[in-house]
């Protein structure tokens, strides 16, 4: 019984500590998901709609647009 009470108190304390020390920039929930909101307005902006390149297709090392994620001028494997 004492252990259960201690666990409940610990969880309540950690929850209160999390809310007390959370960084609130003054906007609250306004800018919580700005990118997701932009993607809802413009579905083409979503990364899920972008096509990845298959093996042996030319790729850009900096954009990492290969399906496998390995690019050495051409997508590997």
UniProtKB/Swiss-Prot annotation:
Instruction: Give residue ranges for the propeptide.
Output: 23-49
Answer yes or no on keyword Signal.
yes
- Pfam families the record matches: Conotoxin
One MF term in GO for this entry? ion channel inhibitor activity
Disulfide-linked positions: 52-67, 59-71, 66-75
State the InterPro entries in the record. Answer: Conotoxin, Conotoxin_omega-typ_CS
Written domain comment of the UniProt record: The presence of a 'disulfide through disulfide knot' structurally defines this protein as a knottin.
Among the entry's GO cellular component annotations, what is one? extracellular region
Q: What is this protein called?
A: Omega-conotoxin TxVII
What does this protein's UniProt record list under function?
Answer: Omega-conotoxins act at presynaptic membranes, they bind and block voltage-gated calcium channels (Cav). Specifically acts on L-type channels. It blocks molluscan dihydropyridine-sensitive calcium channels.
What top-level branch of life does the organism fall under? Answer: Eukaryota
Family statement drawn from the similarity comment of this UniProt entry: Belongs to the conotoxin O1 superfamily.
Q: Where does the protein end up? A: Secreted
Tissue spec: Expressed by the venom duct.
Keywords attached to this Swiss-Prot or TrEMBL record, sorted alphabetically, are: Calcium channel impairing toxin, Cleavage on pair of basic residues, Disulfide bond, Ion channel impairing toxin, Knottin, Neurotoxin, Presynaptic neurotoxin, Secreted, Signal, Toxin, Voltage-gated calcium channel impairing toxin
Signal sequence extent: 1-22
